[in-house]
Amino acid sequence: IYGWGHKLNETSPLTPRPDLTNQAYTTADGTNYTSDMDAHFPVAADTVINFYAYYPYQASLSNTLASYELKDQIDIMYATPILNKGKMDVQTEANGSTAIVALSFNHQLSAITIVIKKADDIKETLVLQKVELVNYPASVRMDIQTGQLTTSDTKADYPIPVSYTH
């Protein structure tokens, strides 16, 4: 998760909050995510935070562009940004000490699985030798603020592992 703190209605420059910059969040129950860091909402009423989130997490990310190798076949997601969130705007837990910021994630790219089945009326033995995606981008960059993807100019072929059952 990234958090940019700024004055309300200010458009630039937006400075990342050091306590919210690229913090990893983990989950034990698959629903609620927490982090080891301790962040506080600004006290001033005219100071707000923009929240941006992406998956999978990259500890080395230092700007808004996350890079992924497509050969890794991983789900790539970004959250719909939550903009201009101030201390008075957040829902808190019952004791009022923990702010809840609900993020809605969108799939940008997903791992794929291909299943090829022989028709029941074919009696001959068929052997599938190869399945391959040819001439696809080798990598992609995702802007975590917009979800926009940019592919690399480098192309690659992706063999898809074949397992045979009959």
For the regions a language model picked out, list residue spans one by one.
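Short, ordered, surface-exposed loop/turn motifs in non-cytosolic proteins
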Residues: I1-H6, I122-D153
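Conserved small/polar residues in nucleotide/adenosyl-binding loops
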Residues: T165-H166
